[in-house]
Design a protein with these regions (language model features):
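Active-site-proximal alpha-helix that buttresses catalytic centers in soluble enzyme cores
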Residues: 1-288
Length: 288
């Protein structure tokens, strides 16, 4: 005899999947294309797909231009052509965009975002652009994890929340000018609340900014400093973080990379753009 269908609040929710014909999610990857940036982007895309089965996730490189690393413009042009082919078969126009572009950036970088918008315009795809991933509490969690992995902060294995730190001052390193530093400062306040130590944001792409920030922290009483990159990774040249940390006389953690929250925030931005309601955890809201 068939099992009776559950009802009420204990009923198992219907599995979430991408709607048929939903726009492609195109991850805009900055920086010089490499096997490392491709691997990272593929892992982030995989996280997004695992949260939303059926998601058409693609990768476009802002500085790409060949089959191995296709440019953002080329990926969007192809998505638009595929949408047009579907419209011809269906005999009716698709009301939505061909793609939604999500920048793989923790914070704003106006010069890079201008290039992304230009690629979108050149493609003629009518694609939509989401916000960058931060500021967000989950990025503060990711920074905490990277610091703990480097031995620069103790990890609370139960909840990763409000614990003592091995460093008594944190420099949050970003790129993208004053706007990026201000945005990083918001996540920095969240990180400071978690670790109970001062956190100041500084620009990696401004000469001497990291060293000046280190001196500011030391002048306020901090001695054991740590540099935490508020960066996904591909947007900066190899060795830049290490060089800045050495100049400032402090240890450094790894970039955020393909931490799980990064993939969930990518999906959350996409879902908000196309009107898909995600479960709480997939929306990038910390679960307490």
């Amino acid at each position: 005899m068939p099992r009776a269908r559950q009802s009420g609040r204990h009923r198992r929710p219907e599995p979430l999947a991408a709607p048929e014909g939903a726009p492609a999610l195109v991850l805009a990857v900055p920086g010089t294309p490499s096997s490392a940036s491709r691997s990272l982007a593929e892992e982030v895309s995989s996280i997004a797909r695992s949260e939303l089965p059926g998601l058409d996730a693609r990768i476009g490189y802002v500085d790409g231009g060949d089959d191995e690393f296709p440019s953002l413009e080329a990926v969007l042009t192809r998505a638009a052509a595929e949408q047009k082919a579907r419209e011809d078969v269906d005999g009716r126009p698709d009301p939505g965009p061909a793609a939604v572009v999500v920048p793989l950036l923790a914070g704003p970088d106006s010069a890079l975002l201008r290039r992304i918008r230009q690629a979108m315009m050149n493609s003629g795809s009518g694609a939509e652009l989401t916000d960058v991933l931060g500021p967000h509490p989950l990025l503060a969690e990711a920074l905490h994890v990277r610091l703990s992995e480097a031995g620069l902060a103790r990890a609370d294995r139960a909840r990763l929340f409000t614990v003592a730190t091995a460093a008594d001052g944190i420099i949050l390193a970003t790129v993208g000018g004053d706007e990026a530093v201000q945005a990083a400062g918001i996540t920095g306040m969240l990180l400071s609340a978690r670790l109970a130590v001062p956190v100041l944001a500084a620009a990696l792409d401004e000469e001497g900014a990291i060293s000046r920030t280190a001196e500011q922290l030391r002048g306020s009483g901090s001695q054991a400093l740590a540099l935490a990159p508020y960066l996904i990774g591909p947007e900066i040249a190899d060795g830049l973080v290490g060089a800045a940390a050495a100049e400032a006389g402090c240890a450094s953690a790894e970039a955020l990379g393909a931490y799980g929250a990064v993939g969930r925030l990518v999906l959350s931005n996409y879902a908000a753009s196309v009107g898909i309601t995600l479960p709480t955890q997939a929306q990038g809201v910390p679960v307490r």
